[in-house]
Structures are given as structure tokens and as C-alpha cells.
């Protein structure tokens, strides 16, 4: 199987597809040497092409499961923290 990538979504764009922040975040499924990952990474625009930065994280299934559990177990605390002024 060749290395491949599938874009799941982007964070930091308006409804017209224009970036609202300097380095938007892309969420992608990717594979490398028959291993599958989810990649959450900041991107920058270079000559009208989005390119990845080193700022991000690549997770395998076990790591993603652990992250999702942490987020789900703490969703109330996270929402409260982010809502406080």
C-alpha cells in the first residue's frame, strides 16, 4: 500500500474558505510504511499552497484512543475552563 493521506477537516477558516488565523490547523488521516495515523498540524501558505509546519502531533490508534478518553472524561472541566473570562 502506498503512503497516503486524506483531509478530514480544517480549523481556522471562515465560511468562504479564507483563513481567519495565520497558521490554520488541518486534521488528516495518513499512512507511512503500512502504519496508519491521524495528523493534527498547523499549516502555512506558500505561493497559494498550504504546507505543514513542524507544529503538530501525529497519533496512532492507541494514542488517539487515550487522547479521546482524556477529553471525554474531562469535557465539563474543559468547557468551564475555556468559558471563563
Language model feature labels by segment:
Residues 1-20:
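Negatively charged, low-complexity tracts enriched in Asp/Glu with abundant Ser/Thr
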Residues 12, 33, 71-75:
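Generic low-complexity, intrinsically disordered sequence content enriched
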Residues 24-55:
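A short, structured beta-strand/loop element
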Residues 56-60:
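Active-site scaffold segments
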Residues 61-85:
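Mixed-charge, Lys/Arg-enriched low-complexity segments
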